[in-house]
Amino acid sequence: MRTLMIEPLTKEAFAPFGDVIETDGSDHFMINNGSTMRFHKLATVETAEPEDKAIISIFRADALDMPLTVRMLERHPLGSQAFIPLLGNPFLIVVAPVGDAPVSGLVRAFRSNGRQGVNYHRGVWHHPVLTIEKRDDFLVVDRSGSGNNCDEHYFTEEQMLILNPHQ
């Protein structure tokens, strides 16, 4: 099994998969009579159908045992999905390009610094949320509407990957 190398999360490196949601280096302007900086349009919510709605949820995630064998990835073909850490803790991101099925050799891993969120574009393969802390909270922005919006792909034993945050 191939061990994934964990990359720092940057806008440039993550661009094929979605948006990095962060204030560092992002354009902003002043509002509220000069008392507030607005970091505008850090990500775009995608929905497939006009009747779909963008919704906001909170996910409370428990850590998985590490090193982790990556056995599956999921995708949301009908909308984007954003994860913004609420407690400031670093977390891990595992992604693969849009396609009929994820290609094991194209899977990449990233580490958020805890002040960065991610917005997966429609159809991007990704592992469910991966917290490093025992328990962590995330603000999630995704889509509500009709139709199946979660496909799962399970790797064969030869395709499985290892994720080790302590490397």
UniProtKB/Swiss-Prot annotation:
It is an enzyme of class 4 (lyase). InterPro entries: RmlC_Cupin_sf, UAH_cupin, Ureidogly_lyase, Ureidogly_lyase_bac, Ureidoglycolate_lyase_dom_sf. The keyword Lyase applies. Its cofactor is Ni(2+). GO terms for biological process: allantoin catabolic process; purine nucleobase catabolic process. It catalyses: (S)-ureidoglycolate = urea + glyoxylate. GO terms for molecular function: ureidoglycolate hydrolase activity; ureidoglycolate lyase activity. The keyword Lyase applies. Pathway: Nitrogen metabolism; (S)-allantoin degradation. SUPFAM superfamilies: RmlC-like cupins (SSF51182). Pfam families: Ureidogly_lyase. Its EC number is 4.3.2.3. Keywords: Lyase, Purine metabolism. CDD domains: cupin_UAH. Belongs to the ureidoglycolate lyase family. Homodimer. PANTHER family: UREIDOGLYCOLATE HYDROLASE, UREIDOGLYCOLATE LYASE. Catalyzes the catabolism of the allantoin degradation intermediate (S)-ureidoglycolate, generating urea and glyoxylate. Involved in the utilization of allantoin as nitrogen source. This is Ureidoglycolate lyase. It comes from Pseudomonas putida (strain W619).
